[in-house]
């Protein structure tokens, strides 16, 4: 053994590391001291050779004693002591046993989280910590990844730790939502970790969904490292809900013969007798694993132990179980299921079963039922189940309380025990008050209210009870004896009482006998003593004393005997544990005394007289009675008293236990019989053989079963529903149960599955069921594959598989044969297509394929299929399909159940639901296909091939390359009967200068990405490039290679025929080079390259290190110049080259200015001699885009142009620059540049992002961006962002679409002229042969074809509408007409636009004259037009405010604080001059103190916070400019950069994500906008007096430029929580803007605020327009008792740059604000100036919508920085609060440097928002700031005028009652009490009434006046002062009618 330690010996200091113990003892012969864990003590025991003293259990070490080898690994959280010499300690005389505090800490459930934390903290160096942390992360990463994969569900906050304690490794990082995530997590653990490990033998699963069963098989196969042991799935369909849950398949007569069964969440529905019937029905069954969902505490009460997990209630004999508060997930089960927890074994005749509870997870229990009884099995035992940490309070003395009402938390009970004894003066309400602070905690939600009440009463009544413990020194032996006698006084007194009683009873009798007898011998303890002679003569003396005359008269028995023989003896008899002195006697007394073990007396034969006996007993009862009195009156002995005290007050921990006993029953049938004639399993065609099972021990031979009941009885109790999806509890006759066997998959991956068989017929094959595949959510087929489907044939739902299915070809293939015969496509290819579209469950059916499969084939291959079945005619496929044919369906004839599809077959009538699958007759021969039309789409087989050379055509070839096998195969290749668009195979030789130029630039890092890669990634490429550079200097000789160049327009189909060519045998050794990773993925997907073959497709730099005989270069013009030559130089094995590209789409341009690659001839010029034809057609582009370029297209889609703000498609966002692409990608959007998208194809509309860089894009790159989509183009954000040059393709395409739209609306207008690409790109097309028809032939020899006529355009307007957006969006995107310039809208009628900009208003303005207008004669001239043209709108109907009921809260209890005394000491003695600054030779004056009242404290209390007043402080504004304003460098307008647009776009989407709404625009509401204008005019004009407006007439001065603002400072005293006791602060600047902007943009902001208020979700709180009471109510409903996050910012207003302007423009466009308003807003923000200079586009306080824009910007930043989801958030301007600390957005680290705004997150359990501390209890005004205001007002004498406002603020928290203390930090409690004290001192009685809880007393006069039945005090506080006085004095009847309903206009916050 090796130990790491540091010790001191007799010699020098030794610092040892990993020394053997023998070496340690040798170096320290004098002994040493070391602390070690307990498990190491046996190895360090003292020995004779090394007298080591006993070792403590902790290591003493020092951080100063370096170097050390982590000796702190043996300690537990103790600070290191100073380095001192340790001396050997002598061994103690008697080593004391280790106490609990010194023992090593024991951790359960894994290593302790902080066991090595001191070791990590000891590492001061960051590198050392990173080294340690890397190993920790490496160890944690697999476990965390596995846990997130297995348990991806988002769990409530405190449940991950609870599940971890239960052994379930769930984490708090789950992200998937679930109706009951905790139950789902437990179920997942049960299936994949608990059951999957126990299925070691062939097993059958019962009552489980098919998807869960498939996943369970995969988990078991991975664990057992072989084929899965789960072979059968048995799902009886017993209710209608089961039919929806389980697959409906027949069930055999007998159960599967597997030794293991697993019953999933159903045991509670079966009785032990039914389980016995199951074992009898399955004689091979040995073990049954069953899961039981049952709250064990249901046996003791109706309140659950885990209410957040489940709730239940009992009704009769049933238990209703609700999962996690979700009523939809509830179900009912029998209450008798608890017998499974109380049964240890089941006996049913000769059958013996053992029941074992394996594990319990809260309400889920794993039960094992085994056949037989084991030898060591206990018939009766006790089990413990999960329960809270609780104690059971005793019953009261007078009555009994239910057990559930006496269970309380142990921690609370113990804390309350200490609390009631620690309080000096305990009040009656103190225990209840303490409990109130604990009862609202989430961890105690299982405690009933009755239990809390019982605990409070118990603590109050037992508080005076104290233990009778005392401690005596016992300094003398006498004290020890007295103490012993005191402790044993009760048993000693009892013994003496009995002895005295027996002695007193025996004395009279003894005296009577001594008269006639003498004592001759005394025997004591076996020793004989001779008594003195006087005792022997005593009877004689007595006889002499008796007169002789009396002797005759004495009774005979009293007369002395004739002889004096001694008969009396005294003896001791020895008993088992005591010795007793006995006096033998006779008679009844002898029997009685013997039973009492008291001394007995032996007498002579003569009986004593009865009076003497009675006298003796009477004397003996005296001490007995006295002893009994003392026994019952005196206290118990101290030990008994303490034991009773401990039992009463120190209760042990309560555990939920069950006593289990055996159970005897009669077996009953397990399942009901489905019908009188059960269906047997039908034989199907055999499956391919599956891999054999691994060797396993054979199951025990089945016992000979005795006669048992049938498997299917006539009735059964309620079927077993699932807790995850519970069915209704009612029982019903069952449908046919389903046994779903699972075969082996088609392929053989490492985990293979055996092919199961049916038990009833072992040799019969079963229906093939493929292995489970990951599926997408179920959606309509028409949404997954959009198109115009005939007869709604695409409306069925489909779960699209994420990977292709591997289902074998079906036997019932008549539909495939019919479609193959019609189209000429092989039926195997058709089946492969269906495997890519449908999941395996939809491909396997006993009835064959259906019309759903026909629709999928028709969509894929562009068919319109007419299906005839009797009189029914249906069409399947697309209405626009170019090909059509007919199929007939023959319905089944009973008893057959399968129909038949065929071409031109006879018809019979049937229903609309058609299925068919009869084996089709083989259609072969020329007649079968010659008469059928053939489609031109889809893959075609290679054989039979056409002739090598068409007649009349001889290719021009070079001698060697052109006659190679590759050249011949390329010329021979046909796709859809069409050859490749080439004339010949060219010979190409390497151009060494081009290769040398490129390799030199690569080596120097001027081109490519190799130089920017990490060193570890470029180790393989750099040596290769250096070698190529050397090879280019001395090139080896090599012959020319064959080369073909396929060039054509975008989307003409250059790649697809080459991909089919590479699939042939000749071209199997190939590699493909792509310019981008995007194209690489498309090629891999098209070629189906996976695993080892994926190397064949790579990007251009990594391809230089690979070898293949065929080289394919895609998009060659996007690669550096000379790449073809360098590739041939790098790979001498290349024999044939295929290059693809379009010279029109631009060429490569180096980004490094030092690169010399641009000096070479461009590739389009270098490769032009090798272009045989240029294919000027397209298969990709929609007709709108193709017609614009004048290019024919085969795409029937019309296409559209739109301006949209949301990318709802899978296509990426195309941006002009790399920087914007990186910014948007970091924000979570898929973005690539225009040029990088070259070669890609997107089925959805492509989104082209426009900014100022779009003007710099050439037409070559613009062509790339416009030609990517199959369906249309979306520009974003608006048409004004299009390039200004009219010849730019973006602008030209927009103008073409506009003109086309106008022409279709009005045919009299000219049709727009398309762009002629042959003229636009004539430089690139010069000398090329252009083909305009894809159906060309080489017979023409490549002659130039004439231009084809343009295809006719559709005339409907729906062509401009996108068809790929889902229907669940609120509105469609902004289309073309939404962004038309206003000067152009005159020439195009509104009816021609797809959407109206202003919908037709339904308001009747004809009656506008009936409404009074405002007299505008006093309005300034600049305001007259807008004021006079708009008529006022009708007032909206006011919504009644919700009724507010006072909560039943406890009155607030305040500690006694003198507010005035606290005010005297509130301000520390500080020199005010130290708080000022010196600016421009002047001192500031924010803390004036001269001539200020100081009646309260030594200094004026106004010094607690800065005072901003420009009149008293001339330096205020100028000194604040540097912090409050940001200036532009010049007078030029601020330019919106690409970064601003990208960040604004990200912020906009984050804001919409916060509102949980679509970013798409909503229709404009002109009526609402008009009302906003009227409201704004009322606020700016009507509500003001004429004098005020005339005084401010300069604000409407026409000479005042509208972009100029006047900056002034805000006068205020900054008394708030963050400004108290601070020094000089910059003032807040306000901007005075032109009235034009206020009147024009003010209605826009009001309109946006109304729209936002409608969409705002409940978890989002905006403080605008809300009262503090509403804030408090929202907090009570949404906040949780957790740590809150406050995101503070540095210079919030000044840090908002261009991205804020872009965000505001996006918001206005979403609201469909007319474009002039948006343009005006952007113009003002980018051109703003003030008297100090030009300003940046920062936020200026005073501009319209300052608060709303600040709030939205803050909210957008929060949702960009964090993953908030539905977390409650409070936002108000730059103030924000998040309910709990959310996870960081993974993209934020990349986005944070791009923002000028710097967040400063702060976490605290006490959240401060807008001056209020908020929490789950509500909101309370920050007490310190409120106290400062009260104290300042008290000092300057203004308190009477302000106290009403302060009382209103204080009443918000006061209304919460005693719960407000949970919201205030402990250090501020004194200020809250001081505020209460000052208000009580100085407020009027009517104001104090607002501080009372509950309703105002029922004053009849007030209530009759207000027509209310009650009036809450918060509402009373809002009344004006006059009304409050009248109400208070009972004079409300004097108020005018309705006066009291108007709240006070005094500010209250």
Swiss-Prot record:
UniProt entry tagged with the keyword Transmembrane helix: no
Residue numbers spanned by region Disordered: 77-103, 674-773, 924-948
UniProt keyword annotations, A-Z: ATP-binding, Host-virus interaction, Hydrolase, Methyltransferase, Modulation of host ubiquitin pathway by viral deubiquitinase, Modulation of host ubiquitin pathway by virus, Multifunctional enzyme, Nucleotide-binding, Nucleotidyltransferase, Protease, RNA-directed RNA polymerase, Thiol protease, Transferase, Viral RNA replication
PROSITE patterns membership: ALPHAVIRUS_MT (PS51743), PEPTIDASE_C21 (PS51738), PSRV_HELICASE (PS51657), RDRP_SSRNA_POS (PS50507)
Ranges for domain Peptidase C21: 762-922
InterPro entries: (+)RNA_virus_helicase_core_dom, Alphavirus-like_MT_dom, DNA/RNA_pol_sf, P-loop_NTPase, Peptidase_C21, RNA-dep_RNA_pol_alsuvir, RNA-dir_pol_PSvirus, Salyut_dom
Annotated positions binding ATP: 1048-1055
Positions with biased composition (Pro residues): 80-98, 685-731, 740-753
Processing after translation: Specific enzymatic cleavages by the host yield mature proteins.
E.C. no: 2.1.1.-, 3.4.22.-, 3.6.4.-, 2.7.7.48
Residue ranges occupied by any (+)RNA virus helicase C-terminal domain in the UniProt entry: 1176-1308
Residues in coiled coil: none
UniProt keyword Nucleotidyltransferase present: yes
CDD domains, alphabetized: Tymoviridae_RdRp (cd23247)
Alphavirus-like MT domain sequence ranges: 171-341
Domain RdRp catalytic: 1682-1788
Domain called (+)RNA virus helicase ATP-binding: residue spans: 1017-1175
Active site: 814, 900
GO molecular function: ATP binding; cysteine-type endopeptidase activity; mRNA methyltransferase activity; RNA binding; RNA helicase activity; RNA-directed RNA polymerase activity
Residues the record marks as site: Cleavage: 909-910, 1342-1343
Stretches that traverse the bilayer: none
Family: Belongs to the Tymoviridae non-structural replication polyprotein family.
UniProt protein name: Non-structural replication polyprotein
Organism classification: Viruses, Riboviria, Orthornavirae, Kitrinoviricota, Alsuviricetes
């Amino acid at each position: 053994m090796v130990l790491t330690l540091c010790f001191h010996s007799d010699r020098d200091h030794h610092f040892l590391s990993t020394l053997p113990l023998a070496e340690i003892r040798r170096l320290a012969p004098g002994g040493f001291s070391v602390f070690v864990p307990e498990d190491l003590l046996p190895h360090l025991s003292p020995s004779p050779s090394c007298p080591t003293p006993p070792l403590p259990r902790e290591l003493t070490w020092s951080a100063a004693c370096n170097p050390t080898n982590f000796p702190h690994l043996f300690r537990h959280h103790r600070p290191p002591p100073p380095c001192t010499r340790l001396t050997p300690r002598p061994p103690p005389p008697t080593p004391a046993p280790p106490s609990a505090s010194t023992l090593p800490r024991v951790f359960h459930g894994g290593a302790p989280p902080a066991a090595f934390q001191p070791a990590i903290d000891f590492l001061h160096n960051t590198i050392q910590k990173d080294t340690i942390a890397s190993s920790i992360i490496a160890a944690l990463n697999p476990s965390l990844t596995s846990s997130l994969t297995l348990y991806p569900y988002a769990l409530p906050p405190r449940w991950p730790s609870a599940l971890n304690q239960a052994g379930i490794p769930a984490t708090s990082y789950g992200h998937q939502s679930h109706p009951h995530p905790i139950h789902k997590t437990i179920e997942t653990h049960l299936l994949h970790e608990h059951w999957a490990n126990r299925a070691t033998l062939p097993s059958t699963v019962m009552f489980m969904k098919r998807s869960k069963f498939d996943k369970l098989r995969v988990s078991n196969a991975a664990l057992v490292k072989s084929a899965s042991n789960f072979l059968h799935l048995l799902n009886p369909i017993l209710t209608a809900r089961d039919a929806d849950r389980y697959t409906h398949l027949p069930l055999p007569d007998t159960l599967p013969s597997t030794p293991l069964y697993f019953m999933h969440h159903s045991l509670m529905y079966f009785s032990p007798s039914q389980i016995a019937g199951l074992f009898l029905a399955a004689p091979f069954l040995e073990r049954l694993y069953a899961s039981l969902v049952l709250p064990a505490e249901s046996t003791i009460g109706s309140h659950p132990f885990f209410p957040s997990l489940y709730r239940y209630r009992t009704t009769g004999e049933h238990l209703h179980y609700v999962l996690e508060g979700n009523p939809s997930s509830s179900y009912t089960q029998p209450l008798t299921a608890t017998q499974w927890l109380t049964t240890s074994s089941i006996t049913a005749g000769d059958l013996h079963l053992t029941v074992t509870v394996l594990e319990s997870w809260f309400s889920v229990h794993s039960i094992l039922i085994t056949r037989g009884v084991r030898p060591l099995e206990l018939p009766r035992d006790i089990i413990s189940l999960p329960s809270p940490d609780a104690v059971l309070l005793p019953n009261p003395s007078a009555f009994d309380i239910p057990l559930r009402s006496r269970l309380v938390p142990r921690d609370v009970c113990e804390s309350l025990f200490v609390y009631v004894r620690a309080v000096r003066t305990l009040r009656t309400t103190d225990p209840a008050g303490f409990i109130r602070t604990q009862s609202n905690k989430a961890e105690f939600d299982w405690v009933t209210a009755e239990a809390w009440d019982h605990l409070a009463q118990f603590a109050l009544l037992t508080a005076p009870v104290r233990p009778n413990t005392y401690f005596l020194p016992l300094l003398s032996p006498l004290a020890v004896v007295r103490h012993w006698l005191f402790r044993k006084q009760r048993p000693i007194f009892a013994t003496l009482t009995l002895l005295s009683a027996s002695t007193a009873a025996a004395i009279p009798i003894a005296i009577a006998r001594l008269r006639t007898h003498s004592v001759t011998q005394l025997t004591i303890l076996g020793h004989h003593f001779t008594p003195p002679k006087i005792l022997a003569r005593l009877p004689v003396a007595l006889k002499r004393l008796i007169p002789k005359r009396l002797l005759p008269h004495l009774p005979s028995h009293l007369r002395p005997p004739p002889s004096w023989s001694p008969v009396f003896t005294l003896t001791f008899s020895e008993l088992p544990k005591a010795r007793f002195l006995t006096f033998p006697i006779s008679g009844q007394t002898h029997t009685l005394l013997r039973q009492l073990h008291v001394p007995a007396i032996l007498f002579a034969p003569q009986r004593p007289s009865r009076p003497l006996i009675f006298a003796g007993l009477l004397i003996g009862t005296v001490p007995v009675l006295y002893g009994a009195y003392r026994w019952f009156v005196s206290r118990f002995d101290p030990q008994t008293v303490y034991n009773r005290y401990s039992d009463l007050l120190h209760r042990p921990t309560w555990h939920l236990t069950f006593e289990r006993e055996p159970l005897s029953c009669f077996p009953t049938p397990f399942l009901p019989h489905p019908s009188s004639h059960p269906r047997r399993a039908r034989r199907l065609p055999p499956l391919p053989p599956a891999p054999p099972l691994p060797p396993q021990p054979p199951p025990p031979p089945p016992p000979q079963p005795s006669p048992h009941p049938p498997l299917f009885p006539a009735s059964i109790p309620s079927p077993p529903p699932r807790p995850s999806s519970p069915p209704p509890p009612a029982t019903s006759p069952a449908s046919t149960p389903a046994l779903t066997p699972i075969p082996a998959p088609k392929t053989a991956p490492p985990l293979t599955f055996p092919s199961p068989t049916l038990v009833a017929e072992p040799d019969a094959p079963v229906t093939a069921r493929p292995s489970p595949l990951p599926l997408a959510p179920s959606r309509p087929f028409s949404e997954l594959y959009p198109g115009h489907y005939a007869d709604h044939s695409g409306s069925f739902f489909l779960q699209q598989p994420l990977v292709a299915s591997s289902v074998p070809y079906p036997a019932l293939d008549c539909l495939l044969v019919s479609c193959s015969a019609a189209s000429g496509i092989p039926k195997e290819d058709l089946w492969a297509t269906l495997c890519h579209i449908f999941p395996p469950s939809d491909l396997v059916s006993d009835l064959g394929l259906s019309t759903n499969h026909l629709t999928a084939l028709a969509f894929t291959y562009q068919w319109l299929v007419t299906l005839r079945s009797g009189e029914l005619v249906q069409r399947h496929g697309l209405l626009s399909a170019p090909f059509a044919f007919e199929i007939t369906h023959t319905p089944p004839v009973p008893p057959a159940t399968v129909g038949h599809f065929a071409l031109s077959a006879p018809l019979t009538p049937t229903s609309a639901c058609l299925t068919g699958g009869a084996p089709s007759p083989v259609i072969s021969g020329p007649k079968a296909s010659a008469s059928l039309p053939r489609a031109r789409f889809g893959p075609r087989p290679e054989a039979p091939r056409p002739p090598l050379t068409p007649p009349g055509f001889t290719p021009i070839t070079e001698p060697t390359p052109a006659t190679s096998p590759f050249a011949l195969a390329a010329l021979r290749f046909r796709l859809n009967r069409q050859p490749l668009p080439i004339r010949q195979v060219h010979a190409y030789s390497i151009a060494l200068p081009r290769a040398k130029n490129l390799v030199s630039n690569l080596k120097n890092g001027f081109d490519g990405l190799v130089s920017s890669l990490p060193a570890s990634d470029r180790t393989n490429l750099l040596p290769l490039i250096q070698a190529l550079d050397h090879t280019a200097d001395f090139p080896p000789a090599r012959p020319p290679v064959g080369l073909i160049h396929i060039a054509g327009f975008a989307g003409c189909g250059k790649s697809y025929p080459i991909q089919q060519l590479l699939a042939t045998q000749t071209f199997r050794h190939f590699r493909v080079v792509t310019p981008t990773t995007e194209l690489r993925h498309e090629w891999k997907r098209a070629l189906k390259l996976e695993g080892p073959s994926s190397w064949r497709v790579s990007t251009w730099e990594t391809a230089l290190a690979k070898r293949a005989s065929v080289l394919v270069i895609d998009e060659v013009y996007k690669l550096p110049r000379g790449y073809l030559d360098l590739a041939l130089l790098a790979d001498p094995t290349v024999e044939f080259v295929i290059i693809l590209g379009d010279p029109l789409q631009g060429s490569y341009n180096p980004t490094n200015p030092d690169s010399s690659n641009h000096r070479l001839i461009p590739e389009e010029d270098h490769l032009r001699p090798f272009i045989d034809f240029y294919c000027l057609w397209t298969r990709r582009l929609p007709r709108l885009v193709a017609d614009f370029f004048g290019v024919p297209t085969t795409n029937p889609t019309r296409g559209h142009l739109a301006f949209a703000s949301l990318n709802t498609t899978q296509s990426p966002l195309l941006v002009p620059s790399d920087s914007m692409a990186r910014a948007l990608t970091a924000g979570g959007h898929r973005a690539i540049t225009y040029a990088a998208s070259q070669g890609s194809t997107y089925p959805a509309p492509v989104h082209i992002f426009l900014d100022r860089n779009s003007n710099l894009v050439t037409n070559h790159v613009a062509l790339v961006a416009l030609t990517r989509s199959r369906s249309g183009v979306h520009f974003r954000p608006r048409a004004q962002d299009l390039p200004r040059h009219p010849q730019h393709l973006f602008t030209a395409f927009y103008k073409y679409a506009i003109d086309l739209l106008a022409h279709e609306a009005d045919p009299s207008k000219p049709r727009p002229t398309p762009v002629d690409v042959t003229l636009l790109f004539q430089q690139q097309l010069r000398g090329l042969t252009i083909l305009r028809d894809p159906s060309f032939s080489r017979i023409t020899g490549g002659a130039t074809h004439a231009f084809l006529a343009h295809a006719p355009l559709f005339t409907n307007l729906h062509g401009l509408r996108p068809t790929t957006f889902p229907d669940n969006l609120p509105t469609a995107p902004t289309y073309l007409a939404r962004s038309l310039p206003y000067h152009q809208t005159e020439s195009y009628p509104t009816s021609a636009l797809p959407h109206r900009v202003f919908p037709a208003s339904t308001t009747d303005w004809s009656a506008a004259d009936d409404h009074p207008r405002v007299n505008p004669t006093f309005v300034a001239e600049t305001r007259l037009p807008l004021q006079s043209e708009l008529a006022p709108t009708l007032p909206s109907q006011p919504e009644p405010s919700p009724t507010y009921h006072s909560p039943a809260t406890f009155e607030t209890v305040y500690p006694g604080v003198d507010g005035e005394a606290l005010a005297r000491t509130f301000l520390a003695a500080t020199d005010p001059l130290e708080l000022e600054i010196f600016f421009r030779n002047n001192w500031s004056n924010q803390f004036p103190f001269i001539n200020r009242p100081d009646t309260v404290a030594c200094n004026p209390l106004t010094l607690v916070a800065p005072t901003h007043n420009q009149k008293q402080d001339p330096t205020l504004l100028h000194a604040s400019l540097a912090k409050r304003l940001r200036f532009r460098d010049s007078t030029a307008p601020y330019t919106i950069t690409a970064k601003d647009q990208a960040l604004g776009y990200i912020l906009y989407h984050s804001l919409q994500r916060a509102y949980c709404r679509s970013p798409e625009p909503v229709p404009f509401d002109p009526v609402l906008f008009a009302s906003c204008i009227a409201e704004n005019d009322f606020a700016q004009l009507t509500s003001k007096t004429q004098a005020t407006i005339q005084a401010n007439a300069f604000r409407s001065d026409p000479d005042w430029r509208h972009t100029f603002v006047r900056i002034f400072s805000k006068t205020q005293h900054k008394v708030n929580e963050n400004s108290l006791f601070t020094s000089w602060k910059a003032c807040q600047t306000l901007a005075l803007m032109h009235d034009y902007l206020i009147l024009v943009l003010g209605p826009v902001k009001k309109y946006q605020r109304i729209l936002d208020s409608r969409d705002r979700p409940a978890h989002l709180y905006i403080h605008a327009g809300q009262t503090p009471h509403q804030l408090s109510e929202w907090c009570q409903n949404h906040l949780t008792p957790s740590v809150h996050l406050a995101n503070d910012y540095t210079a919030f207003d000044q840090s908002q740059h261009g991205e804020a302007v872009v965000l505001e423009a996006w918001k206005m466009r979403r609201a469909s604000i007319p474009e002039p308003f948006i343009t005006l807003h952007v113009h003002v923000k980018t051109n703003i100036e003030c008297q100090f200079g030009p300003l940046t586009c920062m936020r200026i306080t005073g501009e319209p919508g300052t608060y709303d824009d600040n709030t939205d910007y803050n909210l957008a930043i929060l949702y960009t920085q964090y993953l908030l989801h539905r977390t409650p958030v409070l936002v108000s301007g730059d103030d924000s609060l998040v309910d709990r600390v959310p996870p960081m957005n993974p993209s934020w680290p990349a986005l944070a440097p791009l923002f000028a705004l710097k967040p400063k997150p702060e976490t605290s359990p006490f959240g401060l928002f807008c001056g209020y501390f908020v929490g789950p209890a509500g909101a309370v005004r920050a007490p310190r700031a409120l106290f400062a205001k009260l104290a300042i007002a008290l000092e300057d004498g203004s308190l009477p005028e302000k106290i009403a406002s302060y009382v209103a603020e204080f009443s918000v928290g006061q209304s919460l009652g005693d719960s407000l203390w949970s919201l205030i930090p402990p250090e501020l409690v004194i200020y809250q009490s001081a505020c209460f004290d000052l208000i009580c001192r100085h407020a009027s009685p009517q104001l104090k009434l607002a501080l009372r809880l509950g309703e105002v007393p029922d004053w009849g006069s007030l209530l009759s006046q207000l027509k209310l039945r009650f009036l809450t005090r918060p509402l009373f506080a809002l009344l004006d002062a006059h009304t409050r006085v009248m109400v208070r004095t009972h004079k409300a009847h004097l108020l005018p009618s309705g006066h009291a309903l108007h709240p006070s206009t005094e500010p209250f916050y």
